[in-house]
A protein has these predicted regions:
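Active-site regions of metal-assisted phosphoester/phosphodiester hydrolases
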Residues: 1-39, 70-71, 75-254
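Short active-site-proximal "capping" loops at secondary-structure junctions
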Residues: 45-50, 83-84
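Phosphate-coordination/substrate-recognition cap region in phosphate-metabolizing enzymes
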Residues: 64, 68
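Short loop/turn segments at strand-loop or loop-helix junctions that form parts
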Residues: 10, 43-46
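Short, flexible/disordered intra-domain loops and linkers
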Residues: 18-22, 49-61
Length: 254
């Protein structure tokens, strides 16, 4: 029985470095594989782009999702949010365990910025109730984020049983640090880094993190360990640091 889960969240910046200068997906996959996470929450996954597939010789023929999952994460889910003539990008989940159901909800607050909430139910061996894993990437403007957070809390209330183990992770763009209060009051969740270290992690920019934009919110778990993966090497990988957490399921959780 898997009482302990290792999870990661990472905004991969569409698989390229700043200003689309270099292709970074191979470095990103190598880093993810070394972490050996059970479930990975990804944002800005560009699964198709006609121009980049021609420009970058190493662009995977199978698409970014299948390339990242490889053999380590046999199950994956992709939520297409933003579409354009050359392709599309969105949120994604990689899982070592079977994903039994996935829904991508549209939580866009404005026509100019498409956003989604990717919700997957995962069968973890030995658990009698699925893990609910939700990946989000919220908007750049506070007004839009407020609307999106309301959508997220309402959707979770409708689609996630109150007793179910729940993880919400991703890029919240939450400059005002309001998400934690909203999730605590409405969903009974807490942020992993805040519980373990007192404050959410600094995750942006990755080479010298200052802003606390990326989060991991949990319900039904103890937080055993958290870590920010950042530093100079991330200049060639992504503008966001990667966050990981080791979570232990609460014994009396169904």
């Amino acid at each position: 029985m898997h009482n302990t889960l290792r999870i990661a969240t990472f905004n991969i910046h569409k698989g390229v470095t700043h200003f689309n200068a270099r292709f970074a997906l191979h470095h990103q996959r190598d880093l993810l594989r070394r972490l050996q996470a059970d479930v990975v929450f990804l944002q800005e996954v560009r699964d198709e782009h006609a121009e980049h597939s021609k420009r970058f010789a190493a662009w995977p023929e199978t698409g970014q999702m299948e390339y990242l999952s490889n053999a380590l994460w046999p199950d994956y889910a992709y939520g297409k949010n933003s579409t354009y003539p050359a392709g599309h990008h969105g949120n994604a989940l990689l899982s070592k365990f079977p994903i039994i159901k996935t829904t991508n909800f549209d939580i866009s607050a404005h026509a100019s910025e498409q956003r989604g909430m990717l919700h997957s139910e995962i069968n973890v061996p030995g658990w009698d109730i699925p893990l609910h894993a939700i990946c989000v990437h919220l908007g750049l403007f506070a007004k839009w984020r407020r609307e999106q957070l309301l959508s997220v809390t309402n959707l979770i209330a409708q689609h996630v049983p109150a007793e179910a183990p729940l993880i919400i992770a991703g890029d919240f763009n939450d400059w005002g640090m309001r998400t934690g209060r909203i999730f605590a009051e409405n969903l009974g969740m807490h942020e992993a880094f805040e519980q373990h270290a007192g404050k959410p992690a600094r995750s942006f920019p990755s080479w010298l993190p200052i802003l606390r934009l990326d989060r991991i919110y949990v319900r039904g778990f103890h937080v055993k360990h958290v870590e920010v993966h950042s530093g100079a090497k991330f200049v060639k990988i992504s503008d966001h640091a990667m966050l990981t957490a080791i979570l232990t399921r609460v014994p009396n959780s169904p």
